Amino acid sequence: MQKVFIVLQLIEYIVAKMAILDPNILNDKNKELISYGELFDIQKYPFMVYFESMIYTENTLSMCTGSLILPLFVLTAAHCTHEADKYDIVVYRYINTHRKTMRYVKNIYEHESYDHYAGKNDISLLRIEYPFKDVIHYINMSGHPNEFSNGKSLNCIAIGYGQTDKSMNSEHFGYMTNLSIMYGLKKCFSHISLTTEFSSKIPLCSKPNIHNPCPGDSGGPLICNGYLYGIANFIYNAHNPEDMKCGSPHLQSGYLFIYFYRDWISNTILNTGNLIKLCDKLFKISVILIIYNFS
């Protein structure tokens, strides 16, 4: 069973209904992956992976998407790894459309302030045991709130694995779609009441569109200007909170804005014993030198 979007009350800071992926409840209404998306080029996006995990407390097998930001590290959403054991997670990467390889997980690094019920700090890192072979390049991270000043939006790409609107996608092929991404309380949450705590780390959001992430896409990358800007976290419908079906024209998707977590990402990796030199220009995180200890 895949992780699916559910409707719930975010009691700490949202009074309207939103939908996030939750391992405990299956929403059988959501049958699509990236709604109205298309297969992505594996050679162009070699850093894309998906992983399956067994949640024994709920007796469910869940699936999420992730991005290789370094040879040993997969960036994803915390609700994808919450209550999962590292021994029960398997990470897969397609070499081509007919062949994929797998890696086991050595450690899970979930954000220490992650709130599963409120959806705050929904970010996690997986350290795999060994690097995948023949990865041409990894995804670098970037993004800054100033890029969205004066109501500006960016054309971005969302990628994910899972079911499609035409099949159950048993092979878990990856799909992508183009989105117009906004930032700011007025742009993203004009119909939703938020507290100050949430507004300090405002997510990115898409304009209402039939193109949106669905089950299996959670944790997947939002790529803007060729860089990783966000992580797929939730969907919501400000016009009709009861209509959370993928492909609904008023549906919007929300993404954790990596800008607010750049220090957490770099510090978490540094504390694992890996040496990483970061170049921070306009808060853009790019890897210049990586030296790994494979012990």
Give each language-model segment a name:
Residues 40-44, 68, 82, 116-120, ...:
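Extracellular/periplasmic catalytic domains that process cell-envelope and extracellular macromolecules
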Residues 79-82, 94-96, 129-134, 162-165, ...:
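Acidic glycine-/aspartate-rich tracts in secreted/extracellular proteins
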Residues 82, 158-160, 190, 207, ...:
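Disulfide-rich extracellular modules and peptides
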Residues 17, 65-81, 178, 218-284, ...:
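C-terminal subregion of chymotrypsin/trypsin-like serine protease catalytic domains
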Residues 44-62, 133-138, 183-218, 229-231, ...:
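Active-site region of chymotrypsin-like
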Residues 123-129, 134-207:
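Chymotrypsin/trypsin-fold serine protease catalytic domain
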Residues 2-75, 84, 90-92, 189, ...:
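Protease-domain processing segments flanking chymotrypsin-fold serine proteases, especially trypsin-like
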Residues 31-43, 88-134, 144-146, 163-165, ...:
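Conserved catalytic-core segment of clan PA serine endopeptidases
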